[in-house]
């Protein structure tokens, strides 16, 4: 067993790669399971050795990729506290918030040969949980849209400004109505703990969705 800092072996980059790929799959699957878009734009793929649904819509895919491309440098620096997929009704009020709370330890005690396969097993469990989350959630009203919010540590603000210049994909301070949900129902979905990553996924669901 070896103890490494986050700077060793570009380990922050490895974690960011793993997380970015996972979040891309998770966002697509959430949009499919919660029927934000017609099921006809999704195709079945295999990720983490389980079937998932991924969008075939070029503009939607580009938005998701651009968003996560900008999140990735923040993940590398351990500046991300939460990534939130917010589903909004026609009035742009949130009906559901899928919250990924992310913690990366500063010191890593790892066995490198088993590390990534172990993490992928844990991420597979998240994907399976998202696949069946509609069983514990109420139906959403028709005409929903979505947005992705990133909660960063305060020191990350300067990094985000640099990323904006480089990537030409502007970060916008979240509107309060996208963030706030009055007295939501909290539904824990999954928690994982590994040597490189701790992550918790839960859903905040609005009590009265107006379906």
Swiss-Prot record:
A Gene Ontology molecular function term of the record: deoxycytidyl transferase activity
Predominant localisation class: nucleus
PROSITE patterns for this protein: HORMA (PS50815)
Record localization: Nucleus; Cytoplasm, Cytoskeleton, Spindle; Cytoplasm; Chromosome
One GO biological process term: positive regulation of peptidyl-serine phosphorylation
Domain of life: Eukaryota
Domain HORMA: start-end pairs: 13-203
Function: Adapter protein able to interact with different proteins and involved in different biological processes. Mediates the interaction between the error-prone DNA polymerase zeta catalytic subunit REV3L and the inserter polymerase REV1, thereby mediating the second polymerase switching in translesion DNA synthesis. Translesion DNA synthesis releases the replication blockade of replicative polymerases, stalled in presence of DNA lesions. May also play a role in signal transduction in response to DNA damage.
Subunit structure: Homooligomer. Interacts with REV1. Interacts with FZR1 (in complex with the anaphase promoting complex APC). May interact with CDC20. Heterodimer with REV3L. This dimer forms the minimal DNA polymerase zeta complex (Pol-zeta2), with REV3L bearing DNA polymerase catalytic activity, although its activity is very low in this context. Component of the tetrameric Pol-zeta complex (Pol-zeta4), which consists of REV3L, MAD2L2, POLD2 and POLD3; Pol-zeta4 is the fully active form of DNA polymerase zeta. Component of the shieldin complex, consisting of SHLD1, SHLD2, SHLD3 and MAD2L2/REV7.
PANTHER family, per database record: MITOTIC SPINDLE ASSEMBLY CHECKPOINT PROTEIN MAD2, MITOTIC SPINDLE ASSEMBLY CHECKPOINT PROTEIN MAD2B
Official protein name in the record: Mitotic spindle assembly checkpoint protein MAD2B
